[in-house]
Every structure is written in C-alpha cells, then in structure tokens.
Amino acid sequence: MAFALLFTQPGADVVYRIERSAGTGVVVFVLGGEMDSEHAARLRDLITVDAECRVLVDLLDVTFVDRAAMRFLARVEAQGVRLVNCPEYVRRWIAAENASHQENPMPDPSVNMTEDRFTSTDGLNIVFRSWRPQGQPRGLVAIVPGFNSHSGYYTWVAEQFVAAGYAASAIDLRGRGKSDGERFYVAKFADYVADVTAFVHLMKSRQPGVPIFLLGHSAGGVVSCLYATEHQTELAGLICESFAFRLPAPSFALAVLKGLSHVAPHAHVLRLKNEDFSRDPHAVEAMNADPLIAHETQPTNTLAEMVRADERLGQEFPRMTLPLLILHGTADKASQASGSQFFYETAGSKDKTLKLYEGHFHDLLNDVGREKVMADITGWIDAVLTRA
C-alpha cells in the first residue's frame, strides 16, 4: 500500500510531493519549482532521518535560485538522505563544498535568516534577506548587489559576518532578484538610491544604536556611493567592491548609449558574461542555472543612468569624508580597477583603504580567493569600530 501527498509552500512556487510505501519503509520527497534558502529551511523541518525509514529526495524538476539551497542538500545527504535525479552541476558543487567544509566548517545558512520586503515610495515590493548572530550584533552590514546578482548570492558572505558578530542584510534592487519592477530596468538611478535609503532606514529602526556599514558591489557600489554622498552621517563606513565607476568601453560608445536611451530606453543591449565574474567553475555554473539572472540583459536606460551617475560621482568624491574601503580585482573585465584607484585618490576621507587583488575577477566575494577578501573586509570593519 502506498499514498502520496501534494502540497505547496504558502506564497511560493515550490511543490513537494511526499510518497510513502508502507511495505518498503521508504519516504520520497519529490520536489518541483524554484528552490532558495528559505524554502530549503522549511523543507528541512519536513525531512526526518529514521533508522526504520529511508528518505529519498527527487530533484528532477528543481531549479536552484541560490547556493544556500544547494548547501542544504549537502547537509541532508551527509545525514543519510539519498539524492536522486540530482543535476550534475549541483552534484559537482556539493562535492566541492563538502571538501571545503572539511577544512572550514561553516554554520547552517538557514539559521537566523529571514526574507522580508518593504514598499518603495512608488508602490513596489522590495525584497531583502537578513542574517543575525546570537545576541546583540557589533554592527550591521547592508549589502547592495550589482548586475547579474541578487541577495541570494550573499549567503556565504553573511555567514562570515555573523561568525564575526555582525548582522547582515542584502537587498534585491527593483527589477532584480525577487523585487517588483520591470526586469533589469530603472527609469532613474535615483530610484535605486531611494530604495536603498528606505532599506538603510529600516535597518536602523530595527537595530537602533548599531553602527551600519554599506557594502556595494559593482553597480551596487555606484548606488551605494550616491547614497553615501547625501547620508554620510548615517553610516559608520562605506565598502565599494569592484566599483563600476569606469567601464571597459570607449567614451564615444558611452555617448551613443546615452543618446540611445532617449530613443529606445527599454531596449536590452548588453549581456554580461557570467564567466567574467568568477574563476570558480561551480560559481559560474550556479549563475548560469539561476532563473533570476539566466536571461539577464541590461536595457539602454539602465546603463545610461549608471554612466550619468558615474559622471556625477566624479565631482562628488572630494566631499566623501566617512571611512572607505575600496576593493578591486586586477583581472576584472566588467569594470576597471583604475576607477577604484581614482576614487581612492580623490576621495576626501582621511580614513580610506584601497586593496587590489592580483588576478581576481569581477565578483570578489564569489571568486577563487574570496576567503582573503572576506577577511580583509571584516578586519577593516573591526578596525574602524576600534578607532571610533
């Protein structure tokens, strides 16, 4: 005799079917849809490993939205759960993750992680994820991802902050990740800045008195810099990683792009190569399989707005007085390290640090050698708070 139960998680597209065979003592979880860290944490509560019962998880129709969900699979497999129909890219990632954890065991990414949202000034639902340490955090790091990214890519980063005693929150910019808005389009970069302003304000209201650091990656660094120029007293420090201030395109091409944005603002004209983000093949495979960025191309207006924002920032750097940490890889093909160098040289801050990583690609925190970059960031935050 066998029976099956079909159900969905509230407000999600993940479908679970539980099949139990009374005669064999086997329970099969058949999954379908998009799986992220939040859904993985919920599934964990459903799976129990019993000496009298074998548990199988069928992954034939699953698409993984972030690394944390794949990391969850590594943990349940280690507990005796059998994975069937596991995609090859997931299997390779799990093998690499297991090997890494033998040297550096990490905490469960689902612990103290929450997904939430707020409403933007123009009525959009803006999604963000938060991670908290046990007890009062020493500080909070608000993370602004760039293009070809979203908050789900910062689970490992958040784990490191939590291990160091810091809380972390990462936003999905409008039109990206799980947030509302036309996909990958923004009318004005000021809309991004308004969303980050609301995001930081919300973090401060939830963690009163806790120093806040803003970490922006690539285009997220441009947004973070724009915010910081107007709200320096709100932040304990600004971290710009792979700052998209200077782009690998000739000036005449950027001028044409700005002109085209007035004629065809919604035309999608640029597709960034995931292979240029990381030297880690497992990271690239995960990006290629991520439905939230799988078909990401940038509209003319989004790109033109970033160019205009960069032009404005070039005049604003001398006004920057808050502590700055600027990070860039020398082999970055998506943004130029010379832009970070210029920011460092012209910023008015007395407390500023520039670190260039030889041979590193665009996404320093998703690249080979990310542990060194992460240690530099947490060490810098520790030092800033010590001097405060």
Residue ranges and their predicted role:
Residues M320, I326-H328, D332:
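Short beta-strand/loop motif that positions the catalytic acidic residue
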Residues N148-S151, G177-Q207, V373:
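Catalytic nucleophile-loop/oxyanion-hole region of alpha/beta-hydrolase
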Residues K355-A388:
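Catalytic active-site module of serine/aspartate enzymes centered on a nucleophile-bearing elbow/loop
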Residues A158-G181:
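Conserved alpha/beta-hydrolase
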Residues L5-D45:
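STAS-typified acidic loop motif
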Residues M106-G135:
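N-terminal cap/lid segment of alpha/beta-hydrolase-fold proteins
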Residues F29-E103:
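Amphipathic alpha-helical interaction surfaces in cytosolic regulatory modules
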Residues H217-Q298:
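Alpha/beta-hydrolase-fold enzymes
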